[in-house]
């Protein structure tokens, strides 16, 4: 593995029991233009876990853990229970998602974002950034398998792949199922996310040592802009929501840079929000992609239990060149059992039928997307 750092030094305040790792005293960085393992690095839910509150409690604000002093519940609402993490955001007003916290494993704050990892009662380890769930150990596999296998299953023999984000390592884990791959570049802006992976997900971080992998610590949008033209067979954008710093990853200039970096007939897959909440955002993303990608432009979706509304979408686009039929996989990983390395666990979610079904949309979404 080669590691290239392009980050500038920033200060971090580790608060009350946070775990500095690998000599980091100046914490973590916000996923902007290249984020970690899951899509939704929501900006409007910040995480706050502070000891020293009166009665040993912490205030519940925008994606926080509330604690009990043994006598009463403390928070913004009587419905907030102690020992639970709750995720709030302006992107889904009027609703929230909560998980029971068994143990707080890590918490840090930098100039960019809050990073928190806790053990949940139902989904194993849960990573949050700025108070928004990025990935759950036992519930995030549908998102990861689909963001990798929808694009790579649609082209024969992918060799050179770029991952924007993916610092925990779930996306890389899935990608290593393909023996045809010769080079994987991972651009992760947050070095502490990588450190969290090394400490708490060593089975994932071990894959960073694969000789085909180059881990770049830096800005994903800048990396793509500077990339060699027609170099990659596939680019996977595992980004946060299109607000704040990640907004650039959903705009036309970024898609133009991606298209330039892809070979003719190359493919890109990026997370593209929920059809239940964000049709206005999805329509704008599709409009940008249709202006840029001259091959095909498609929207797919899948179910993820710990994301808002329980679903997440993907944009799948190809550049002009050899035709790409995303809806009928030519390289389905579930059919090629010889491609699965012995050290990798079997697929939990993806199969050829799920691949095809991902492009079948409800009538209301189809009519809006096709209009």
UniProtKB/Swiss-Prot annotation:
Catalysed reaction equations from the record: putrescine + S-adenosyl-L-methionine = N-methylputrescine + S-adenosyl-L-homocysteine + H(+)
Residue ranges of domain PABS in the record: 82-319
InterPro entries: PABS, PABS_CS, Putrescine_N-MeTfrase, SAM-dependent_MTases_sf, Spermi_synthase, Spermidine_synt_N, Spermidine_synt_N_sf
Tissue expression profile of the protein: Mainly expressed in roots.
Induction pattern: Triggered by jasmonic acid (MeJA); this induction is repressed by 2-chloroethylphosphonic acid (ethephon), an ethylene precursor, that can by alleviated by 1-methylcyclopropene (1-MCP), a competitive inhibitor of ethylene receptors. Accumulates upon wounding and feeding by the specialist herbivore Manduca sexta; these induction is dramatically amplified by a pretreatment with 1-MCP.
Keyword Phosphoprotein attributed: no
GO MF annotations, alphabetized: putrescine N-methyltransferase activity; spermidine synthase activity
Pfam family, one: Spermine_synt_N
Disulphide linkage map: none
Biological-process GO terms, alphabetical: alkaloid metabolic process; methylation; nicotine biosynthetic process; response to insect; response to jasmonic acid; response to wounding; spermidine biosynthetic process
Keyword Acyltransferase on entry: no
Listed EC numbers: 2.1.1.53
Database matches in PROSITE patterns: PABS_1 (PS01330), PABS_2 (PS51006), SAM_MT_PUTRESCINE (PS51615)
Region (Disordered): 1-70
One cellular component term from this protein's GO annotations in UniProt: cytosol
Active site: 238 (proton acceptor)
Record keywords: Alkaloid metabolism, Methyltransferase, Polyamine biosynthesis, S-adenosyl-L-methionine, Transferase
Enzyme class: transferase
Polar residues composition-biased segments: 1-14, 23-70
Protein residues bound to S-adenosyl-L-methionine: 113, 188, 219-220, 307
Gene3D superfamilies: Spermidine synthase, tetramerisation domain, Vaccinia Virus protein VP39
Biochemical pathway: Alkaloid biosynthesis; nicotine biosynthesis
Family: Belongs to the class I-like SAM-binding methyltransferase superfamily. Spermidine/spermine synthase family.
Biological role stated in the UniProt entry: Involved in the biosynthesis of pyridine alkaloid natural products, leading mainly to the production of anabasine, anatabine, nicotine and nornicotine, effective deterrents against herbivores with antiparasitic and pesticide properties (neurotoxins); nornicotine serves as the precursor in the synthesis of the carcinogen compound N'-nitrosonornicotine (NNN). Methyltransferase that mediates the conversion of putrescine to N-methylputrescine.
Name used for this protein in its record: Putrescine N-methyltransferase 2
UniProt organism field: Nicotiana attenuata (Coyote tobacco)
Organism phylogeny: Eukaryota, Viridiplantae, Streptophyta, Embryophyta, Tracheophyta
């Amino acid at each position: 593995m080669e590691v290239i750092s392009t980050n500038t030094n920033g200060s971090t305040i580790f608060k009350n029991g946070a775990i500095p790792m690998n000599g980091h005293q100046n914490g973590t960085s916000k996923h902007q233009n290249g984020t970690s393992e899951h899509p939704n690095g929501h900006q409007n839910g910040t995480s706050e876990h502070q000891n020293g509150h009166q009665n040993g409690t912490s205030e519940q604000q925008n994606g926080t853990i509330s604690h009990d002093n043994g006598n009463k519940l403390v928070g913004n609402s009587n419905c907030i229970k102690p020992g639970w993490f709750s995720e709030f955001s302006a992107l889904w007003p009027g609703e929230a998602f909560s998980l029971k916290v068994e143990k707080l494993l890590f918490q840090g704050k930098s100039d960019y974002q809050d990073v928190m990892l806790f053990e949940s009662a139902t989904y194993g380890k849960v990573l949050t950034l700025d108070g928004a769930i990025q990935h759950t150990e036992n519930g995030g596999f549908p998102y990861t398998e689909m963001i990798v296998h929808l694009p790579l299953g649609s082209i024969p023999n992918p060799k050179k792949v770029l991952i924007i984000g993916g610092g925990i390592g779930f996306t890389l884990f899935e990608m290593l199922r393909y023996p045809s791959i010769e080079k994987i570049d991972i651009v992760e802006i947050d070095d502490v996310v990588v450190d969290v992976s090394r400490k708490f997900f060593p089975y994932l971080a071990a894959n960073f040592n694969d000789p085909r992998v180059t881990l770049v610590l830096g800005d994903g949008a800048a990396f793509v802009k500077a990339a060699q033209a027609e170099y990659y067979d596939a680019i996977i954008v595992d980004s946060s929501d299109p607000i704040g710093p990640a907004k650039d990853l959903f705009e036309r200039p970024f898609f133009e840079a991606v298209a330039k970096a892809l070979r003719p007939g190359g493919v890109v897959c990026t997370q593209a929000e929920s059809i239940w909440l964000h049709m206005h955002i999805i329509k704008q993303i599709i409009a940008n992609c249709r202006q840029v990608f001259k091959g095909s432009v498609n929207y797919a979706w899948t179910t993820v239990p710990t994301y808002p509304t329980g679903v997440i979408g993907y944009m799948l686009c190809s550049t002009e060149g050899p035709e790409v039929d995303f809806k009928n996989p030519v390289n389905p990983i579930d059919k090629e059992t010889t491609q699965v390395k012995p050290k990798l666990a079997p697929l939990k979610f993806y199969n050829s039928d799920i691949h095809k079904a991902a492009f079948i949309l409800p009538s209301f979404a189809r009519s809006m997307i096709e209009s």
